[in-house]
Amino acid sequence: MAGNAYSDEVLGTTNWLKEKSNQEVFSFVFKTEDVQLNGKDIGWNNYKKELQEDELKSLQRGAETTWDQSEDMEWESTVDEMTKKQVFIYDSLVKKCLFEVLSTKNIAPADVTWFVQHEWGKDQGWHCHVLIGGKDFSQAQGKWWRRQLNVYWSRWLVTACNVQLTPAERIKLREIAEDSEWVTLLTYKHKQTKKDYTKCVLFGNMIAYYFLTKKKISTSPPRDGGYFLSSDSGWKTNFLKEGERHLVSKLYTDDMRPETVETTVTTAQETKRGRIQTKKEVSIKTTLKELVHKRVTSPEDWMMMQPDSYIEMMAQPGGENLLKNTLEICTLTLARTKTAFDLILEKAETSKLTNFSLPDTRTCKIFAFHGWNYVKVCHAICCVLNRQGGKRNTVLFHGPASTGKSIIAQAIAQAVGNVGCYNAANVNFPFNDCTNKNLIWVEEAGNFGQQVNQFKAICSGQTIRIDQKGKGSKQIEPTPVIMTTNENITVVRIGCEERPEHTQPIRDRMLNIHLTHTLPGDFGLVDKNEWPMICAWLVKNGYQSTMASYCAKWGKVPDWSENWAEPKVPTPINSLGSARSPFTTPKSTPLSQNYAITPLASDLEDLALEPWSTPNTPVAGTAETQNTGEAGSKACQDGQLSPTWSEIEEDLRACFGAEPLKRDFSEPLNLD
C-alpha cells in the first residue's frame, strides 16, 4: 500500500482501529418509543427542549461541528434542521449518561475507549449505538452498566421533552422508559441455564466491519437505513466523510486478512456446545485428563497422586459431589476405552523382558506344582481379561485352602486397578460397587441363591441393569469376572432345594482352574509386577490375547473339563546369553540319567590316559561324589569349551569311582 495514496486521516483511523482490534468492549443501544399519556403523543422527535446545563450545551455544539465537518460538499443534504437538532440533542444526552456513569465508578474518561454512532432503521427508527470499554471493565459488569445508563437516559429524556406534561405525567414517562429498557445490552443466552449473559465485541472489528460500511442519511424524513453522525474517544471517525469511512473499512479488512488460511476442524461436540466455557469447566476437564492419564480410580489414589487438584475441588461449593462425579467420569472412561488386559500390559517394564524368566514367577510355580502347562493357563486367563473369552467371561479359582487362589486373583486385581468388588453381605445391592469397572472381583464366592440369574448374566459378559442403593438402576457393561471359592458354586440352593438346572450353565461361563496343591508357608505373595511381565512375555512370544490366537496355539477353546497339563512344557533351563525359554531342550549329565556308562577298551586307548594315580575321589554314590560330578559337568557346560584330559579323568572318577573303573578295564572284552 503506497503511503501517498491515502490521506493522513484515513491512514490514522485505520492504524488506530488495528491497535484496538482485539479490545473487548460492551455494546449498548439507546432508543426511544412512541408513548401516549392522557391523549398526548410523544414521539422520537419530541425531545428538542433547549438544554440549560453548560456541559450539555458544549456537547451539543460538538455534535453540530461533527455534522458540518463530515458533510460531503459534492452533494447537498436535504435533512431538515429539526431532525438535525434532535440528533444533536440525543448525542449530547447519550454522552452525558456515559460520563455520569464513569464518574460514579471513578474512571477517568482518558482511560476509556468509546464509539458513538446515531442511526436510522426502517423498522426501529432512530437509535444510537455505543461501544465502550477499558482496563477497568469486566464482562460481569455489563448488566450493571445497562441499569445505570437506563436510569440516566430516562431522566435526561424527561428533562429534554418539549411536550407540556404535568409532574405526574413526567414521572410516568420516566417509569415507562426505565421499565421498557430503552437502553439495551448485547447478550447471549446460555443453552443450559437459559439465562442471558453479557456478550463483548471486538472494538476495531465491530467498527470497521459494521459501522463504517453504512451509508449516510441524506433525506428528511429518512427513507432508508443509515447513519447520521459518529464520534469516538480518539477523534478519528468524527470528521470522516462517507467515502473515507468506506475506504478505512476496506483497508482495515485487507490488512487484517490472514496471509494463509488455516483450516480448523470442529468436532460435532464443539459445534453442539457452541458456547463459551467457564474457567471452572476448563479446570475440571484438565484435571480429568490427568486423572485418566495416571489411571486414578479411587479417592485415595487421587489424594496421593494429585493432591493439589483434590484440595482445589474439595474447597469449592459442593466439592464432595464434584469429586465423586469427576472420579466417576474417570472410571467410566477407563472402563469404556480399555480392557483389564490393556491396563495390566501398560504397567510392564519391557526393558526387563530380556532377563525375565517365566517359570520362576510364583504364578507359574503354582501351576507347575499341578503338572500344568503354565503358558497355556496364563494365555487362557489373558484372553478372558481381554474380553475375548466369549460366553466364558469368568476366571474361577477353586479348591482347598492355601492353594494360591487368592494371591493370584489379588495380583491380577491390583495390576488392573479399576476393580469392583462383589459384596455378599449387602443382600439387596451386592453389585453396588461393580459399575464402570474393568474387572469384577468375587472373593470367597458361596451359594448364589436368589441372585443366580443375575450372576449368570454378569459371568457371561452380558449388559444388564442393576439396582443401586439410594440411586436409580445403572447399567453394567460386559466386564470380566475373577472369582475364588472353596465351595462348589455349580450347586445352587434356594432355600432347602437344590436347583441342578443351573449347574451346566454356570460351568459354561467359567474358566475352570482347580488348585489342589497346598503351598508351603514361606511361599509368599505374588509380586505386583509379575502379571504385567507375564502379559508382556506372552505378547512378545506370539501369544495374543484373542480366542483365535488361543485356538491356533492349543487347538480348541477351553471348557470346564480342560486338561491344562497337555501339551506338556519341556523342563526349562537358562540359555547362555539369552532369556530362559520353556521350550529349550535340557542338557543332562551322566548322574542325571538313571543308567551307568561303561566305556569300551578301544575308547580308553583313544583317550590315551596316563596310568591311574592314587584315587583321592570318594566312591560314587555318596553325596559328596554326586556334588563333585555335577560340578564337573556344570563347569563343562558353562564354559562351552573342549575339556582337558585332566578334566575328563576327573569326571570319570567322579561318576564311576576308582574301583569300578579298574574292574571294568581289567576284564577282557568279549564282542560276541
Swiss-Prot record:
GO cellular component, one term: host cell nucleus
Composition-biased stretches (Polar residues): 614-630
Principal subcellular localisation of the protein: host cell
Ranges where the SF3 helicase domain occurs: 373-528
EC number: 3.1.21.-, 3.6.4.12
Keyword field contains Transmembrane: no
PV NS1-Nuc domain ranges (all copies): 21-259
Ori-binding: annotated segments: 191-195
Domain of life of the native organism: Viruses
Biological role stated in the UniProt entry: Multifunctional protein which displays endonuclease and helicase activities required for initiating and directing viral DNA replication. Also plays a role in viral packaging and transactivation of several promoters. Binds site-specifically to 2-3 approximate tandem copies of the tetranucleotide 5'TGGT3' within the origins of replication (Ori), unwinds this hairpin region and nicks one DNA strand thereby initiating the rolling circle replication (RCR). Cooperatively binds Ori with host PIF and probably other host factors, which activate the nickase function of NS1.
The protein's name in its UniProt record: Initiator protein NS1
Organism: Murine minute virus (strain MVMi) (MVM)
Lineage of producing organism: Viruses, Monodnaviria, Shotokuvirae, Cossaviricota, Quintoviricetes
